[in-house]
Amino acid sequence: MNVGVAHSEVNPNTRVMNSRGIWLAYIILVGLLHVVLLSIPFFSIPVVWTLTNVIHNLAMYIFLHTVKGTPFETPDQGKARLLTHWEQMDYGLQFTSSRKFLSISPIVLYLLASFYTKYDAAHFLINTASLLSVLLPKLPQFHGVRLFGINKY
């Protein structure tokens, strides 16, 4: 029973990234994270860009690829219980505008971090590993796949 619910979706996780202003809010939050890290006096600019990239990708990995289920009681009979947020988004359809945006944003941040770190080897390796760890689970070939049984239940 959903008393006082204002949406008509069975699972609100499926359409949240299509809400008005969510992409702008996402970009503003990443920019705000970068400004906060820049305000810490003993961090150099390359370290700040690498930290921005790593923190962004870690948060994206946790919220999109680790957390399962829905925060709501949904009338879908628990179908979303074993799915991550990424797998629930846009009803599982691949290559939607929201999925493209969330796939391109870490790449853009990676390119910015690589440029501002002047392609330093240590920063480059950290940023590349961070990018791959968040980009590979987004590929259609990994939809519903649990490597080594991790996050299976």
UniProtKB/Swiss-Prot annotation:
Source organism, top-level taxon: Eukaryota
Gene this protein is translated from: Ormdl2
Keywords: Endoplasmic reticulum, Membrane, Transmembrane, Transmembrane helix
Membrane topology designation: Multi-pass membrane protein
Record topological domains on the Extracellular side: 127-153
Name the UniProt record assigns to this protein: ORM1-like protein 2
Subunit and interaction comment: Ceramide-sensitive subunit of the serine palmitoyltransferase (SPT) complex, which is also composed of SPTLC1, SPTLC2/3 and SPTSSA/B.
InterPro entries hit by this protein: ORMDL (IPR007203)
One Pfam family hit: ORMDL
Cytoplasmic side: 1-21, 64-105
